[in-house]
Each structure stands twice: as structure tokens, then as C-alpha cells.
């Protein structure tokens, strides 16, 4: 099932310039998800990171993995309209390849464990069949206040 940007914006609260998932290519609710982020030189982070050689900041690769995991949560639950996803921990993060404008980040997220409102994920960013970044996340799902 492909999920376009308009539905992604219905599922998570992030907006430009902090919306870091452009499309979902495949989703298996309660199991896994694959999405993409097209990296372009017009994005604001590249004005300072780094002007002579733009490089996607690692923290934004981590954020893209977390956003994709939140989309997986939203599609796995019956409804998330009254729920929020809060990141609790980030572990074992590794950066293995530079990502730059012109690259397409293929983001993968797998649910490792779900107990009540606590979910654990393994995620990675791939560029041209190489791992660019990988991380493990724990998130909590709470009712909106």
C-alpha cells in the first residue's frame, strides 16, 4: 500500500521544514514499513550544513526514522486521532554513509516489540543499497491532552 504525502500529513503532526518522509512505499501494519525521503539542495539545513559540501545532518536521518515509525503506529492502531507518539529513547545509532542532495533515503522500520503503550523499533536509512544510518527507538503512545 502506497501512502502519499497528503495522508502522511493526516497521520503525523510534522510539517515543512520538519516533515522528513515524502512517501510510504510499503506497509505491513503491526510489523514493518518502508518509506522514502528525497533529499534536495533547497532544504533549509543545507544553508549551514555545509555550504561548500551539503551533507544531511545525522540527527535529521534519525528524525526521519522516528517519523516513519510513528506512521507505522498510526496505521497499526484503529485510530490515532486522539493519540500522540512520544519518543522515549534512541539507542545504538550508527552513521555509515554520507547523505547529500540528490540522494533518495529509503527508510525501513520494523516493530521489535509492543507492550501496552510502549513500542520498540529497529530502523535504518538506505541510500543506493548501502546503510547510511541505523538506530533502535522506544516510543510511548499516549492520549492527547
From Swiss-Prot:
EC id: 4.2.1.59
Gene3D superfamilies on file: Hotdog Thioesterase (3.10.129.10)
Record organism: Rickettsia prowazekii (strain Madrid E)
Lineage, opening ranks: Bacteria, Pseudomonadati, Pseudomonadota, Alphaproteobacteria, Rickettsiales
Keyword Lipid biosynthesis: yes
GO CC terms in record: cytoplasm; membrane
One term of GO molecular function: (3R)-hydroxyacyl-[acyl-carrier-protein] dehydratase activity
Keyword terms of this UniProt record: Cytoplasm, Lipid A biosynthesis, Lipid biosynthesis, Lipid metabolism, Lyase
Function: Involved in unsaturated fatty acids biosynthesis. Catalyzes the dehydration of short chain beta-hydroxyacyl-ACPs and long chain saturated and unsaturated beta-hydroxyacyl-ACPs.
Cysteines joined through disulfide linkages: none
GO terms for biological process, alphabetical: fatty acid biosynthetic process; lipid A biosynthetic process
InterPro entries: FabA_FabZ (IPR013114), FabZ (IPR010084), HotDog_dom_sf (IPR029069)
Record's catalysed reaction(s): a (3R)-hydroxyacyl-[ACP] = a (2E)-enoyl-[ACP] + H2O
NCBIfam families: fabZ, PRK00006.1
Active site: 49
UniProt name for this protein: 3-hydroxyacyl-[acyl-carrier-protein] dehydratase FabZ
Family: Belongs to the thioester dehydratase family. FabZ subfamily.
Domain of life: Bacteria
Location of the protein in the cell: Cytoplasm
Pfam families according to UniProt: FabA
